[in-house]
Amino acid sequence: MNIRNSFLALLLLALPSNYVASQTAATAKGESAIRGRDAVATVARLSDKNTAGRLTGHAGYTNAAKYSLSRFTSLGLKGQLQAYPQPHSVLDGGSLVATLNEEKVHTAELLKEFLPLLFSDSGQTKAPSVFVGWGIHAPELGYDDYARVDVKGKFVVCFRGTPDNDPKWVYHDEHRTRMKVASERGAVGLIYVYSTVIAHPNGDLIPKFLVTMISDSFFDKLLTAEGSTTEDLTKQLRQTKKPASFPLDAVIDLSVKARHFPKSEGYNVVSWLEGSDPKLKEECVVIGGHLDGVGDHIGLRFPGAEDNASGSAVVIEIAKAFVKNGLRPKRSVVFVLFGSEEQGGHGSAHFAENLPPQFKKMSAFINFDMVGMGTKVNTSMSELMETHRGKLEASDQGLSVLGNIRMVRTLGVRSGDIVPFFKKGVPLIGLSSNGPRPEDLYHQPGDTHNLVQAEIMEKTSKLMFRFGYELANLD
């Protein structure tokens, strides 16, 4: 028996002798309603052509939201679409040509070697380029990638990341911050270097400012005159923790074709089961995941099956279990499918500030993001949730699906939908399955429904139905 299993055994022994049996009895009827094959079918429906990749603000996302609401209301739950402003863009095409030494030409292959970010303005610009490390201007932290280079009228090229993992860099690692800094210094556009080119909608349009990403292998072609590579520069920045900016011997000709919709709306799908206790029903346990994806672009569908139709399907299965269970918990349970996670978390932020008026307090938050592939589900738990760790471990009995448990003590730029709940001091837990996942999956056309697996979604749904019921039924 390994250390983790030994610890679990001790926890179970420490609980009252009838605890696990009573927990199982309380949720048995609901658990029997959870079916992995139903979750897979939901993923297929949410990632089909009618939802157009579910980019919030687009009609395809609205179709997905209306369908999801119908799934909740068909169970007899109350529900609504919670609207908020969400501009969006659709990318129709683009091109990128780099000229080195005024003679050698490299044409980037769309989607493989470059892809405009989904908040870039449309247009065509030809300009010199400058490498600016992490693209960070933070004089208050004693760090400035722009200090010794002139970027006016040029493209800035940078990596995504920070000198180290200190939380002090979080603001400076946001796309919006980097774009603002570059634009204010007169740059005509920003070019990210990523290991793999992906679709990315998390930013705001700046007029006449173009934004794209290129692969590290394409950037290596631009570095031949310097005798350097992407790996060399990354290693230098990490080791020295000092700027290493310099002009590139490359003129970039970038064209972006996109349509922008500044007045579109997004929706959270909100549904709830009222608690049985006259007083405690004003408190709620929130169970959610983001419904949105990155959309359809350049004539291709980005289905978003694993990310995050899988999480949405699990929330629907858990809602079904609560309804079919018959025994309502003392607190209310609110089921939410958030919009705009991929565009900056606007949906979850809006919900956290706009609870349905009958609820006075959020007692806990459970979030699912990419839970459809693998054999275990890993968790990120806030310190305020740690007191219930024993109940979580006990809920795994007979399932053996619970993987690593990580404590969340600070927020990062990629923390997703847990952010507004963490800031409000709501005890929370986030879940993601352990994969593995193909390289062409994340924010790419390869994220298709045939890859998600019934067993992991069924076990995850049962685990968190048990645990969610416990949280909602606490005295």
Where are these regions (language model features)?
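Soluble metallo-hydrolase cores and metallopeptidase-like ectodomains found primarily
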Residues: 24-27, 116-143, 148, 208-304, ...
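Second-shell loop/turn segments in exported
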Residues: 25-33, 49-59, 116-120, 131, ...
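N-terminal capping segment at the start of a domain
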Residues: 26-28, 33-59, 75, 80, ...
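Noncatalytic luminal/extracellular "stalk/propeptide" segments of secretory-pathway proteins
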Residues: 36, 44, 52-155, 160-163
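Metal-dependent peptidase/peptidase-like ectodomains
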Residues: 107, 211-212, 219-230, 338-441
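Extracellular/luminal Protease-associated
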Residues: 108-213, 274, 302, 320, ...
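His/Asp/Glu-rich mid-to-C-terminal helical/loop segments that flank catalytic regions of hydrolases
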Residues: 214, 320, 324, 438-475
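Short helix-loop-beta-strand segments that form the rim/entrance of peptidase-like active sites
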Residues: 319-346
